[in-house]
Amino acid sequence: MRLTLSCLVVMLVASPALAFEGVMEASLSSEQGVAARVRARYSKQGDVRMDIHSVDEDGEPVRATTLMPSTGENYFSIDHGQRVIVEMPYSTLATTSKQVTGSGDNANLAIKKLGKATVSGVETRHIRVIDKDNRTVIDLWLTQKYPADLWTRAFRGRNLGLELSDDERSKAMKKYGVKPGFSMKMRVEQAGGVPVVFLVKKVQRAPVPPEVFALPEGYQRIDGPSAPQP
């Protein structure tokens, strides 16, 4: 199957931007309302913690965390309701990244530049990306104010069906004359699907205490799936 730009915002592997230390807060919503609230925190050493707050089918709150240390071979997915920590190797992410290498060269897109707009107090460039092969429309509101890889670094440990690495995304954007940037807002609409909107509420540079990136005590710790063997 040909890998495409179905979610240009992807979040697989990126080089840590060590200069950024602080927090990003965002929401994920659809026509039915806000589906999840996201809070990502970044250390100046390159550690990332992402917390997602949502509700289950019964309306009960659900809180999940992904911890991605800047050193070591593993990252951690934490289910606070079950009090479980799943330890997974970074090598699984590297394997997925190899599968998308080169996909930005073959992207069959139409690009529309729709002017400027202010999103959460930040001036942005509104770009519409139309994936002709998959009938997907992606609206991006881009800024140069923040590192472009903050989304990728926060989400790379979660399986969201997002397909391009930062390098491939940038390659595809540049091919069509668009300067890559940080997405303050993203709207993704696939043919026959429900539009989904990622909206950044706040990005703030601020010191983050080391204990934010520590694993919680008293949780059961289990091994997750290993990387497939070549």
Predicted regions and their residues:
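N-terminal signal peptide c-region/cleavage motif recognized by signal peptidases
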Residues: 14-16
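Extended soluble regions of mature proteins
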Residues: 19-230
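Positively charged n-region of N-terminal signal peptides that target proteins for export
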Residues: 1-5
